[in-house]
Amino acid sequence: MASNQKFNKHAVYNQLKHVSRELKYPKNIDIDKNRSHLNYSLAPERNLTEFEYLKKRLDEIYIHSDRQDINYMSGWIITKPKELPDEYEEKFFRACYDFLCNRYGGDKNVISADVHKDESGEPHLHFCFVPVAQNIPNENMVKVINYLKENPDANNTKATKELGISRKTVRRYRNCTDKDIKYEKLSAKDVINKADLQSFHQDLQKYLDKLRIPARVYTGITKARGGNMTVQQLKMQRNHLIEHGGNVDEIVKTIDNILNEFDNGII
């Protein structure tokens, strides 16, 4: 079972502290500190803290504004299916990590990837990453930068005339350099969109099947219904069918099977 999360500037701090088990007073009472040594990381080893690397990566990409509600980081939580034999655990999480890296731009966008084994229930992977999309730099900025590289002594009047753009635009970009031309941008909206969410479980299942890892993370429910139904929605549907009678035994049985799959961490 997998679920997606998005984190604004303030939520990033608590999330990274949580996954690294550095929160002094964690809200999650299910954490057994005596088992925390069993947790492990799949993220690349770096000489930077997670916060330092996040800042470094954000400096490399275009960010439209600094609003408080912008999502600076996204994340997936993937839980090991109950029926998966323990000997496949590390291979399963490594495969999930590789799948996520391939899907979201590679290791350079990974902030953390921690497998937790110190909570109740099955082990699970917290995969946190910067949602990076393709960016098309401002055309006039590129023009000004390239022109001034070739004509460093040109004044604003000359640049305006030869480039065919306004004097205001030349002044705006005059002090920019190649570092300001960014072909990547921060955009959780573009990366974690409806199509991505709807295809996620099925794509992950195909990847695991290709590696012959006997884990079920997709049952076809998403495809059949156009989106995952919550446990509460399924229970309400089942109870409605039972209450109103009719030949609904098979339908109720099907819904019960789906609920069992939720309980087992399959979907």
Regions found by a protein language model. Give the residues of each.
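N-terminal nicking endonuclease/strand-transfer module with a His-rich metal-binding environment
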Residues: M1-E150, A154, K158-K168, R172-I267
